[in-house]
Every structure is written in structure tokens, then in C-alpha cells.
């Protein structure tokens, strides 16, 4: 992993990622902030424990590739890239503005450290399969991570990619599914029931782990297991997360896929996060 501030704990990294995301949300007064709060622990472990990269050289050939399939989660990835010092912190004030490198839906052409342009849901895993196959053929030892959502499990292209990854035995591919149980149209299982999820990926030849995606210790173990797994097969970490994790009054909102938050509520949310882990 990158050599960045090893004296800072992973829970503190997650707290900072949440804070960066809230500050960006405050700039626009709205956004996919619940997803960012929910996935912050995953991103903290990914960027400060698991992946290899150089903050001052985002295009370094030897890096692990971290793909964000879910384009509307861009605010979460920006927060992690800011914490990783790939993007300067002062840029968060430009979030969503004209000519910003931080558009509301991620654009790889604009943003350092963003490997792909996501957004048309269901395509990220297929891109990850192609990258993984190409890296293997080049003899690279880099891993490809693909973060995708439970909503993307509604897309047939996701399952075509899952089958292909198993067929090609892509042991350099690590999928991460954010199962937060909410989509734009309502609760995920009410839109299309994808359970039982683990056995489906196992049937396609994947090594499967399912964990609490807001448990730092469980995430560390899962990422370590995925990287160290010796069988020639792709790996997937199914992360059950809580939307708006860490800010109780936002967690309690029934429909929090896209949040519009009053000015005083942003301040309260940041105050709650600042009262959390500090070391």
C-alpha cells in the first residue's frame, strides 16, 4: 500500500473520509451522501491497507487498479482520494462546479486516481475483467479492485462478467459489492431479489466472503484473505453496509438514496463526525 501516515488509524481514516464527503455535500446542498458515509470504512481499508499506489504518480504502471463502477458514488471516491493526497484537499470546495475536477458523477478524464468513468450501471465489472485479463497477459502482479453496488446486480452484464471472470480464473480480480439495500426505486430486494448472493458467485467459480462492511477489523481480514487466497479464481467481498453510517439522523431517513440536507443539518452532521474517532 502507499506509504502515507502509518501513525493514523484506519477508523480515523474512515472518519476523515466521511468528513470530506460531508464538506463536499455541503457545497452543493445535496448528493449521494448516504452512500459515501456507508462505504467510508471500505474505502479506508482499501486505500490505507490493501492497495498499492503512489499518490504523486496516479498513472504509475505498477499500481493496483481501483475501479468505481457506481458513478454516482464519486463523492465517496473523491473523499478517499483527498485523504490519500492524490487530490488536494482544497479542491473539495469546487465539487460539482463548472470546470471542476470533481464533477458530481465521476469522469476519469477529469479526476486523478479515477480509473474509469462509471455511471451506466452494470459495466464496471466487465471493464475490471478486461483489465485483469490484460494485466495477467502482461505478467503484471497488480490487483484490480471493482467496487459495485447491489443495484448493479439487477443488470445482466454484471452476471456475464462474473461468469467470464470465473472462466478465465482471474485471481488478480477482487470484487467488492456494497449491499446497502437501497436503490433509487426503493429497497433493493423489493426491486429485484438477488439473494442468496454468495452462492451465486460461488457457482461462477469465485472465492466468496460476506462481512459487515462497516467493521474495520472484518474488512482488514477480508482484504488480506482475498489478496492471499492461493486458488486460481476471482475473489469477491460482499459488504453489508448501512446507508449514512455515522450520522444517526441521516441513517433514520427512510428514503436516503439521494439526500437534500438543510444548511444547519450539514453543520450538525459534521459535528457528529468530528466527535468520533480522532486517533
Curated annotation (Swiss-Prot):
Metal-binding among keywords: no
A GO CC annotation given for this chain: plasma membrane
Membrane topology note: Multi-pass membrane protein
Co-factor: note: Binds 1 thiamine pyrophosphate per subunit.
Pfam families: Transketolase_N
Keyword Phosphoprotein: no
Cell compartments where the protein resides: Cell membrane
Keywords: Cell membrane, Membrane, Plasmid, Thiamine pyrophosphate, Transmembrane, Transmembrane helix
TM spans (from-to): 31-51, 67-87, 115-135
Family in the record: Belongs to the transketolase family.
Protein name: Putative uncharacterized transketolase family protein y4mO
